[in-house]
């Protein structure tokens, strides 16, 4: 009797799950979710802290020519980047530590620390960049 009840419970759960899955995908085509990254810290090991006032999300793409060097800068708020193409080396100029990112990598940039980036590859770098800033502010400060 226990086996029958357990089997019935599993069949009912499977039927309910199938209905929910079908409701989520009304086209009849399968939906595949592939996790790309999960981070709780920046590239330099800081905890990710969000702005305390009204948050604005800014999304942009960056195209960085082969051999190009970005100026030394910092970000007062969280910045995330997905490397769509190319190879980028980011160096924390305060510590000298460098990280190299390639196509498919996800970057959680350091917050409030001076750094610069160099396209170390032979092809252009293309980044999808997402900033979370206090509304009305910018997220890049150039070092003078």
Where are the predicted features?
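Glycine- and acidic-residue-biased ligand/ion/polar-headgroup-sensing regions
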Residues: 76-95
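Ligand-binding loop in jelly-roll beta-barrel domains
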Residues: 112-137
């Amino acid at each position: 009797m226990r086996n029958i009840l357990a089997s019935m419970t599993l069949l009912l759960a499977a039927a309910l799950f199938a209905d929910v899955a079908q409701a989520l995908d009304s086209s009849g085509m399968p939906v595949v979710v592939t996790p790309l990254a999960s981070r709780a810290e920046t590239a330099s090991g800081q905890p990710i802290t969000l702005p305390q006032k009204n948050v604005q999300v800014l999304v942009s793409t960056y195209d960085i020519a082969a051999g190009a060097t970005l100026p030394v800068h910092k970000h007062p708020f969280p910045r995330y980047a997905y490397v769509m193409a190319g190879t980028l080396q980011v160096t924390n100029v305060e510590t000298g530590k460098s990280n190299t990112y390639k196509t498919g990598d996800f970057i959680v940039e350091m917050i409030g620390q001076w750094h610069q980036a160099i396209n170390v590859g032979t092809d252009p770098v293309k980044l999808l960049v997402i900033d979370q800033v206090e509304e009305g502010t910018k997220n890049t400060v150039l070092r003078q």
